[in-house]
Amino acid sequence: AGVNVKGAPNENFAREIMELFSMGVGNYTEHDIREAARAFTGWNFEGLEFRFNAAQHDDGEKEFLGRRGRLDGVDVIDTILAQPVTAEYLAGKLYRYFVREDLDPALQRKLGELLRSNGYRIAPFMETLLLSRDFHAPESVATRIKGPVEQAVSTYKKMGLREIPGAPDFNELTGALGQKLL
């Protein structure tokens, strides 16, 4: 694990939580990153287990996204989740994964409100998403799911294989997935 201790906080972790996993780019400041990093000091892992070392935690006063106090990592996460932009960002990621890339900003706000109003519970959100007109619209069909041939070829590429089986074998493989080529 990287260094993440009082006096040497790991700003990368704080930045990645906000940028990649919760809020997206531009919804926080460099000051917020530094303060969040301080709040996460003492957080680490050993193997696959979370470890908190209170002696390595910066328990001083912090200000993060307008919240002041002796904040720790849980406080930072709670503050991030309280931001409407977080729900909108996560709703957008889920929509783009399950439906299609093109997402109207007004719909993203509405989906974010739904996610947030349900305490970030995924089941009610997914039920709404999977039963939505957008999910079943012709322009959404097959935009996120690979067909059997595309799936087989991309699997070979990801495995680093240079040769794809000949027609009979490849047709048998894709046929088992529901799409015969020949």
Task: Please give the residue ranges for each predicted region.
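Non-catalytic, conformational "gating/processing" segments within enzyme and secreted inhibitor domains
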Residues: 1-104
